[in-house]
């Protein structure tokens, strides 16, 4: 059965989650032998030629709307070689390119492989306190902030648009202290425009799909959309410093 087929012993049918995600290497041997078809691959392997061909099927829509291609994640820049090749081929057809990143990457490699073919960068900033960033995101934020400074400096000497974004999470990223620190950091680096991403509780229902039976709760408001008054408070922290805020409500 699937448990016996797994070379990493990542399937434990007696556990609530069934699949131990930390052990799974996505070899898909369990999928190949699953007798009921309950396990299946999500996504497909695709080569660059096929990917570019699929993307360019919408080229007429890009031209008519002024749109283009956004690469997101996860962290898309964990695959910098592929992103760079994709963007370079799209720019040969004058397709607008945008990348969304949390900026945990080697900036010199990014500057050589991806930046020359990028029109717009969405840069997510979550927490200014490094200890809190490590607690909630798994890593400190020193290199992220340094990358932000470098990319901002590069963008000032080019036509690249950089739009910093702050995802709002109740009692974690949306505190006055954290948002004020982010706003001051943006000012130091010449930011004039940014975007706040209102909290969306729909993610809670996605947990079981990722094999988690634990329902996270970080206080009142976890299961609710953020009220307009709270969005106004967050917006004012940036606009009081002269930073224009984009917010889709």
Briefly describe each language-model feature range.
Residues 184, 192, 207-237:
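A structural motif corresponding to the C-terminal lobe/cap of the Radical SAM core domain
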Residues 49-209:
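Conserved AdoMet/S-adenosylmethionine-binding subsite of the radical SAM
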Residues 37, 92-93, 241:
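Conserved dinucleotide-binding and phosphotransfer motif residues
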Residues 1-22, 29-45:
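Iron-sulfur cluster-binding cysteine motifs and their immediate structural context
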Residues 42, 197-199, 248:
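Conserved beta-strand termini and adjacent loop/short-helix elements that scaffold enzyme active sites
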Residues 240-249:
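Radical SAM enzyme core and accessory elements
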């Amino acid at each position: 059965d699937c448990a016996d087929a797994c070379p990493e012993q990542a399937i434990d049918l007696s556990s609530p989650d069934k699949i131990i995600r930390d052990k799974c290497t996505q070899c898909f041997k369990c999928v190949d032998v699953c007798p009921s078809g309950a396990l299946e691959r999500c996504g497909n392997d695709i080569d660059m030629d096929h990917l570019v061909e699929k993307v360019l099927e919408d080229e007429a829509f890009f031209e008519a709307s002024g749109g283009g291609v956004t690469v997101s994640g996860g962290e898309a820049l964990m695959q910098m070689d592929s992103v760079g090749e994709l963007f370079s081929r799209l720019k040969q057809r004058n397709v607008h390119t945008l990348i969304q990143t949390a900026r945990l990457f080697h900036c010199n490699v990014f500057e050589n492989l991806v930046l020359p073919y990028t029109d717009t960068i969405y840069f997510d900033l979550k927490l200014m306190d490094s200890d809190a960033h490590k607690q909630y995101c798994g890593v400190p934020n020193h290199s992220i902030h340094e990358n932000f400074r470098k990319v901002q400096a590069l963008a000032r000497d080019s036509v690249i648009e950089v739009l910093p974004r702050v995802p709002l999470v109740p009692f974690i990223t949306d505190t006055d202290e954290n948002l004020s620190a982010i706003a001051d950091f943006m000012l130091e680096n010449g930011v004039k425009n940014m975007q706040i991403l209102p909290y969306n509780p729909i993610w809670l229902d996605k947990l079981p799909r990722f094999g988690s039976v634990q329902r996270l709760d970080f206080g009142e408001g976890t299961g609710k959309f953020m009220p307009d008054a709270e969005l106004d408070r967050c917006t004012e922290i940036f606009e009081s410093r002269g930073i224009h805020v984009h917010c889709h409500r």
